A protein has these predicted regions:
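Non-catalytic beta/alpha edge segments that cap or flank active sites
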Residues: 1-165
């Protein structure tokens, strides 16, 4: 069972001016037999606050996976990728690149996404878009593809290639 933290990053959501639908959608789409959501929080687009919450989930709660939603666009307040990179120990760019490539097959506007994917300690962090539709599409793609990486990160598996006979 993988432990998961979900962070919705939205000024309006944090202020109670907008209902968060993307964070709950992430939780809904996580297979219940494999993923246990241990934290869900809505925070504003504040770089330090985002970084602090990521550190808490990685270092204190020790989540295996942290999924963020929101703050990945071009708005001056969209700083989720920067806050994520601030606390990263290792980059895992293939995940964000693959998500963008998949999303590009659905809409050319996906090229405007700036989400990052990184590792801190034994936690994989993936920035997802903010819209419910984009979150749903991203989760469909992501869930079938990251478990092997999580297993390696957590020490459950050490082989990426086939074994010699």
């Amino acid at each position: 069972m993988y432990t998961v933290g979900i962070i919705t990053i939205s000024d309006k959501g944090a202020a109670g001016q907008r209902e968060d639908k993307s964070g709950p959608k992430i939780k809904e789409l996580l297979p219940k037999d494999k993923y246990d959501v241990v934290s869900y929080k809505i925070i504003p687009d504040e770089r330090k606050q985002i970084a602090d919450e990521l550190v808490r989930l990685c270092d204190d709660v020790k989540c295996n996976l942290v999924l963020t939603t929101g703050g990945t666009g071009f708005s001056p307040r969209d700083i989720t990728p920067e806050a994520t990179m601030d606390i990263a120990e290792r980059n895992a760019p293939g995940i964000a690149e693959a998500l963008r490539a998949y999303s590009m097959s659905l809409t050319p506007k996906a090229m405007l996404g700036r989400g990052a994917s990184v590792i801190r300690k034994n936690t994989l962090i993936v920035n997802l878009p903010g819209s419910v539709k984009a979150v749903s599409e991203s989760m469909d793609f992501l869930m079938g593809n990251i478990e092997h990486g999580l297993d390696i990160l957590l020490g459950y598996d050490s082989e990426c290639g086939g074994k010699l006979k």
